Amino acid sequence: EFTIYGVLIAVGALLGMGLVTLEAKRNGEDQNRYLDMMLISLLVSVAGSRLFYVAFSWGFYKENLNAILDFRNGGYALYGGLLFGFFAAAVFCRITKTSFWQSADIACPGILLGQAIGRWGNFFNRESFGEYTDLPWAMQIPVSAVRSGEVSGAMRDNLLTINGISYIQVQPIFLYESLWCLLLFLLLMAMRRKKKYEGELFMIYLAGYGLGRFFFEWFRTDKLYIPGTKVGISLVISAILFAVFMPVVIIRRV
């Protein structure tokens, strides 16, 4: 059974891989090697993103074990996918005796393009939203489609009823992140001929995405938390990415 969520993820992945192979050709690299690397990394990242999501949503899944294998309705964590995917790419580069940093520089614009497109899957899956808003571009979601713990008091106080169905009106965090990824994509495409060292584009990607995601996570209400705390795991990872890689980018640029 196909879902719009799955279709958008697939479209983003295909366009991203297409761009990576074109960039590989432009750099005089073996396109087939990059295609192999991306396919392997994609498969590993899908599994990793699911495992990451389940691990940090264990309170729900331990009572609904069958839901762990329900891959049709979302339940994927991007950072889990990136972590597992980059690890797979690093292993692939080591086996093929090629530079991971060079490969990552070539791949990251395609990854960002895929992220920008794939985030729209969250719209159709009613995920990645923030607090109540009455802005014209507010995301409207049926209350029945949202877990009760993700519906705040402000959302309940401002329900919108259409044809007898109650909707919450919330910030479309997925949209903001999609636009941020598109902006970073354009930045990296503009810089790819001006980079000073291997790994520069990749580190800009990590620092830039971490910066944007850090702010978006503050407003997101359906975030994943570190067990036993009210601290979002993506918030922590985003802060680490920015704090580690942005100084390196600045210092090596100077």
Residue ranges and their predicted role:
Residues E1-V254:
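A feature for loop-to-transmembrane-helix boundaries and adjacent hydrophobic helices
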